[in-house]
């Protein structure tokens, strides 16, 4: 099988970003103790990262859109590396939060520009699969990077987890340098024209679907460690094992979502959002024993990431005149859902409803996303392809 080196380089970058984004979720109790805050307060570090992605996605994309894509992507990974180093040496909670925000500024633009690059190096009928290949690095991070970072945090200290992740940033920069063509600087974007594209009702509807889909995921995933500790009475070793299993589910779902979205974006969204809603409603009952927890985490992981490629392609297709900006803003929308999901889960916990209600809240959000897809499906084109420019 011929290796597509640009896609491989993008997947390596996605692996690093996935590790730094998701590893704190398995380390919330450890980080909370380390900076002397509550678990819900530590959860706000995840929300802060998500807010940084929202701000950084359009800002960094517009600032770098006239640069050669290789240079832009390497610069974004340099920000990633610096942010993780600063997180590792942060002396207190507020400094750690600011460091996480800095780290997050690369996220949306990397995946946004990366999605356009991925779609441009394959035939049009394989664009969703190409985007899924890049996101495979994100899912593989949950199999290897996140559990390894969790283990480092539990055994050596959470600071070492961030430092090791910074090392991934260096590897990513090297791989991007040698794998992507140098290219030349592009024309400066027509900001008003591209922003006008984003204001279209069908684009806004697609972005809102992304917010709700991601919100459903992060309502539970942000607090996955204490949820498993509460419902399953899980040990740290079992939590780590479940993170690996969730990562396997992510990878399977990402692959299936990309393949099926090549056939039907809306159909793929409907099917997997329904599955996501059902499995989250079942988790409080299934996860009462370790076998049920393992089954539910694997299915939940698959359903969660199966919606990612179609969500990304949906926005890129309805905003094909501004593929880079729309793709980046969609990543920002994903992380707005991240922030809202973390806040929703934290609100459930703070209200005293118990950790068992956290996945139920996630199911409610998934139901809203599914409803929106049904309402807007007739207006969403299935045949528009992403511009390769």
Curated annotation (Swiss-Prot):
Gene Ontology annotations for the cellular component aspect, listed alphabetically: plasma membrane
Q: Name one GO molecular function term.
A: transmembrane transporter activity
Cytoplasmic face of the membrane:
1-6, 65-70, 122-130, 181-203, 258-266, 312-330, 378-389
User: Topology: which residues are Periplasmic?
Assistant: 28-43, 92-100, 152-159, 225-236, 288-290, 352-356
Q: Where in the cell is it found?
A: Cell inner membrane
- Organism lineage: Bacteria, Pseudomonadati, Pseudomonadota, Gammaproteobacteria, Enterobacterales
The record ties this protein, via CDD domains, to: MFS_NepI_like (cd17324)
Give the UniProt family note.
Belongs to the major facilitator superfamily.
Q: Which Pfam families match?
A: MFS_1
The coding gene here is: ydhP
Transmembrane segments annotated in the record for this chain: 7-27, 44-64, 71-91, 101-121, 131-151, 160-180, 204-224, 237-257, 267-287, 291-311, 331-351, 357-377
Q: What is its main location?
A: membrane
**Keyword Membrane listed:** yes
Stated membrane topology is:
Multi-pass membrane protein
Protein name, as recorded? Inner membrane transport protein YdhP
Keywords, A to Z, come to:
Cell inner membrane, Cell membrane, Membrane, Transmembrane, Transmembrane helix, Transport
Per the UniProt record, the source organism is: Escherichia coli O157:H7
Q: Which PROSITE patterns does its entry note?
A: MFS (PS50850)
């Amino acid at each position: 099988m011929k290796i597509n080196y640009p896609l491989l380089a993008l997947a390596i970058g996605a692996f690093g970003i996935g590790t730094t984004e998701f590893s704190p979720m398995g380390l919330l109790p450890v980080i909370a103790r380390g900076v002397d805050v509550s678990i819900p307060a530590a959860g706000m570090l995840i929300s802060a990262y998500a807010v940084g992605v929202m701000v950084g996605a359009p800002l960094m994309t517009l600032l770098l859109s006239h640069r050669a894509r290789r240079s832009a992507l390497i610069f974004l990974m340099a920000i990633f590396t610096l942010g993780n180093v600063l997180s590792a040496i942060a002396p207190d909670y507020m400094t750690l939060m600011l460091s996480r925000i800095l780290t997050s500024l690369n996220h949306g633009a990397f995946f946004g520009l990366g999605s356009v690059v991925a779609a441009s190096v394959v035939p049009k009928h394989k664009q969703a699969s190409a985007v899924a290949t890049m996101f495979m690095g994100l899912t593989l991070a949950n199999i290897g990077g996140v559990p390894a970072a969790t283990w480092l945090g539990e055994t050596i200290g959470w600071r070492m987890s961030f430092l090791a992740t910074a090392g991934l940033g260096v590897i990513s920069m090297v791989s991007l340098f040698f794998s992507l063509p140098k290219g030349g600087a592009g024309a400066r974007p027509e900001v008003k024209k591209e922003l006008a594209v984003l204001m279209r009702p069908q684009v806004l509807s697609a972005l809102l679907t992304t917010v709700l889909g991601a919100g459903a995921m992060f309502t539970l995933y942000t607090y996955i460690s204490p949820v498993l500790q509460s419902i399953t009475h899980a040990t740290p070793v079992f939590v780590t094992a479940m993170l690996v299993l969730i990562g396997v589910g992510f990878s399977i779902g990402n692959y299936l979502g990309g393949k099926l979205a090549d056939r039907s974006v809306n159909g793929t969204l409907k099917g997997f959002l329904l599955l996501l809603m059902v499995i989250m409603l079942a988790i409080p009952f299934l996860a009462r024993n370790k076998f049920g927890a393992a089954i539910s985490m694997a299915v939940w992981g698959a359903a969660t990431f199966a919606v990612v490629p179609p969500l990304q392609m949906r926005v890129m297709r309805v905003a094909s005149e501004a593929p880079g900006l729309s793709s980046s803003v969609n990543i920002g929308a994903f992380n707005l859902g991240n922030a809202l999901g973390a806040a929703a889960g934290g609100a459930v916990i703070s209200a005293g409803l118990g950790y068992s209600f956290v996945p139920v809240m996630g199911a409610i959000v998934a139901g809203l996303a599914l409803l929106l897809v049904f309402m807007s499906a007739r207006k969403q084109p299935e045949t528009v392809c992403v511009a390769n420019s």
